[in-house]
Amino acid sequence: MLREAAALGFTHAELSHGIRIVLLPGVIRAVEEGIIKISSTHNFCPLPTGITQAAPNLFEPSVPDRREHEQWLRHTKRSIDFAAQVHAKVLVLHLGSVNFFWFNPGRTLKTFVRRHPTVSVPDDKAYRAVLKKACEKLRKRMGPYWEQVKASLEEVRAYAAQRGVALGLENREKFEELPIDDDFPALLDSIAQPHTCGYWHDTGHADIKQSMGMLDHQLHLEKNAARLLGFHLHDVTPDGRDHQPVGSGHINFEMVSGFWRPHHLLTLELSPRVSRDDVIMSKQRIDALIGQRFGG
């Protein structure tokens, strides 16, 4: 896999949340032989023993259950250790979700859209009213989950700092997932020193949230620009499929590229079903934007 990425012209790769333990010897060998460098990894990497497919939300830092929290902490620390071992600069993290047991207001939004296929979402007045009420319910219920997220970060911030691994807190695409997008600046400002935490921006997730009326993609980047560590770059098609080739959807990557800085990590995060030619095309489009942004 890493050899194939190198053959396509990539000098760096992110190790995803789908790396099984049996793959580690080959990964480490590829790094030691200089075939490719690892820029970032994604929690949990490697996967917990016995898990054979991607499972970034297997254990959540928002869950107050002691046993699940201990598993999250154990495997996150192991992921930090592995990131340091392969000289990755950033470990990308999900921060969990709010559990609604019986009634998830996010489903209300989906139901409204399904029952009103001709309305213009997110601008429709009735939709905006449903969205406002749903967001109020999310805020009302999130308190203990949000406090648990902050406590969980407190348990790993110094551990990561000691190992020179930055923690990239990723924006998410589902209604109930944390953080609520407006809360990133306050969260990052509240973390005690020393810490390496920063904001990790996923273009597809932001676009999906924008289509729901929950954020403005450009304004969201402006608010978090000073805290950015890197980007997951992928497009979203008009029917809402993300992790698609750059240029195949409606994301304004020229706008996104305006927020890139030389120290940022840029990762193409494409679906495994994307063809080799589309991977190459996506790389070429990002390379062209890098050239426009930084010259050369």
Predicted regions and their residues:
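Active-site acidic/histidine proton-transfer and metal-coordination neighborhood
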Residues: 61-198
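Acidic-residue sensor for enzyme active/binding pockets
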Residues: 14, 170, 269
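N-terminal pre-domain/capping segments
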Residues: 1-80, 84-88, 107-126, 144, ...
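Histidine-acidic metal/acid-base catalytic patches
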Residues: 1-6, 21, 34, 78-93, ...
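Residue-level "edge-of-site" marker
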Residues: 18, 44, 96, 173, ...
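Short, basic/glycine-rich phosphate-binding loops at helix/coil junctions
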Residues: 56, 128-132, 232-237
